[in-house]
Amino acid sequence: INHTRELNPSVFLNAHVSSHDCPDNEARAIYYNSRHFGKTRNEKRITRWGRGSPLQNPENTGALTLLAFKLDEQGGDCKEVNIWVCASTDEEDVIETAIGEVIPGALISGPAGQILGGLSLQQAPVNHKYILPEDWHLRFPSGSEIIQYAASHYVKNSLDPDEQLLDRRRVEYDIFLLVEELHVLDIIRKGFGSVDEFIALANSVSNRRKSRAGKSLELHLEHLFIEHGLRHFATQAITEGNKKPDFLFPSAGAYHDTEFPVENLRMLAVKTTCKDRWRQILNEADKIHQVHLFTLQEGVSLAQYREMRESGVRLVVPSSLHKKYPEAVRAELMTLGAFIAELTG
C-alpha cells in the first residue's frame, strides 16, 4: 500500500495475538497519503484491532510489542500479522537480550532475520559523522568515556536539563552504535567457525548492550546534576538490607545520621521504563516515605499511576514526554528541571 496511485490505499490483515487469549480479528492497514493529493499530511495506521485486543487495553500502555508481518512470496500485499504484547519485564528482557535496549517510543522495523537474528546492528541507522579516538579501534571504551567524548557534540542552544538529557542520550547512543559497528561488523562479515563462536559473540554483544542501557541514563543524570548546581548526592550508597538506590540526596552520611531531618532526604531511582519495574524501588530507602523515580516511559495507565502514587512513588519525567501521559495525571508529574530546582532552591 506504500504508493500514490490512489487516495489512501489500504489492505485487510488477519490479526492473530499469540501473547493473549483473544480471537483473531480482521485489522486494516491504511496509508493516508493525502499530502500527495494536495492536502496536509501523510501517515500510516493499523486500525480495527477488535474489542478485547491487548493493543487497546490501557493497562498495556508502554508495553514492548512485536508485530510480525507475513510477507507475500509473490510480492503482493501482506495478509497476516502475528502480535505479541509483553505482559512482564521477563518477557521484555528476553526480547532486549536479542536486540539490545528498546528505547521507549522507538520503532525498530525490518526483515525478521536482521531484527531478531541475535546480532542485529541495524536497529538504528549508524551515524558516521563522528571521528572516534584511535585507541577505541583497539578496545571498547567504557560508558563514561563515550559520554565524555559525546560532550563536544551536544547541541548547545538549550539550558533546560530536560531537553539536554534527551539530546545527550541521542548523541551518546549514536556514538555507541558506531563503536559497536567498529568492533563487531568485520567479525560478522568473516563468519564463524562454529556455533560456539557465534554464541560467544552474540552473548558479548548482548551483555554490553544491557550494561550500557543500565548505566547510561544514570551517568547522564549525574553529569546534569553537577552542571546545574546539584552537587550533594551519593550514587549506589548502601541502605537497609544492603540495598543500593541509584541516587541519595544529600549524601549517604546524611541518610545514616539519626539526627539529620528525614524530610530533607531524597531518593531518586532511575528506570528507562517503569511499567512493573517501579515496584523494585519501594524498599531501597526505608527512611524516605515518598521516593522519586526518573523514567523515559512514554505513558502509564491511570490505574498504574494511582498504584504508584499510593505506594509513595513520584514520577520524574522529561517535560516533552508529559503529553504521553493521561491528562488527569500530568499536573502531578515532575520535570527533571523541577526536581533539580527543589533540591538546589
Regions found by a protein language model. Name each.
Residues 74-76, 91-94, 277, 301:
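Eukaryotic short linear interaction motifs
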Residues 52-55, 207-215, 267-272:
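Short, charged/polar micro-motifs that form catalytic or ligand-binding hotspots
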Residues 222, 226, 232-345:
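Catalytic core segments in nucleotide and nucleic-acid processing enzymes
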Residues 1-64, 69-73:
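Long, contiguous, compositionally biased segments that the model treats as domain-scale units
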Residues 72-86:
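Short, Lys/Arg- and Gly-enriched loop/turn segments at beta-strand edges
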Residues 85-127:
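Compact, glycine/acidic-enriched structural inserts
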Residues 129-215, 219-220:
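Interdomain/boundary linker segments immediately adjacent to catalytic/signaling cores
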